[in-house]
Amino acid sequence: MRTTWDAAAASDRVEQYVGDPTTAREELDSLFARLGDDPRGGTCVEVGCGFGRMTGFLAERFDRVAAVDVSPRMLELARSNVSSRNVEFVLVPGGGLDPLEDDVADVVLCYLVLQHLPGRDLIASHLREFARVLAPAGRAFVQLPVLVPGLRPRGWRAARGAALPLVAGVRRGVVERPEYRGFRLTGGELEEDLAAARLRVTARDESAQSPYRYAHEVFLRLEKEAEPG
């Protein structure tokens, strides 16, 4: 994944890959509003900060922002774009949020990120990491595409998964790579992976018009389940 997102950061069209900075505040406010929340203060972990298009606005809301990304080149851009003194930029591995400590986040934000992860195992590992870094009373705000029910969407997912590595071997562009195109969970798989991560849904919404083929655009507010015993 690091190679793919370093390549995106090196492009003169980086906004094409990570989103338009001019709409970042509106998207952020809309995400919180559609989930009936307006979090402020405390520590926010921004998962997949990219070149920092939302980071500065998060710094206005929260006392501290840990903006994490898998790409060193994206973090270089983010540091040059965001001057807020309450932001720490953190390089993380592709499958987790190390070196962040347990229970450190009052809020976890993951927006336009899970859609790019190339397999269910990586999505599930990120959900577990959200639970790990969340404080006991913390909330995670997550956006992701969820496959619509039916045989045709399932068939499309299988065919797409088989074709993407072949296409990436012929075409070298960022958008052809599995690490950009991502994987689509079914609703049942998402429920299973949330349960395994000990995360519960406290608010949910969907876009009226999804930008994803054969998938709903889903927005979730998540909280940690209490530890047993």
Give the residues covered by each predicted segment.
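C-terminal alpha-helical "lid/dimerization" subdomain adjacent to the S-adenosyl-L-methionine
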Residues: L147-D193, R204-D205
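A short SAM/SAH-binding and catalytic strip from SAM-dependent methyltransferases
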Residues: V107-D121
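Conserved class I S-adenosyl-L-methionine
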Residues: M1-P39, G41-G50
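A short glycine-rich, Lys/Arg-flanked "PGG" loop and its adjoining helix->strand segment in the class I
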Residues: A124-P136
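Conserved beta-strand signature within the Rossmann-like core of class I S-adenosyl-L-methionine
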Residues: A137-L144
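A short acidic, Gly/Pro-enriched loop at the edge of an enzyme's catalytic core
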Residues: D98-V108
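Class I SAM-dependent methyltransferase SAM/SAH-binding core
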Residues: F51-G96
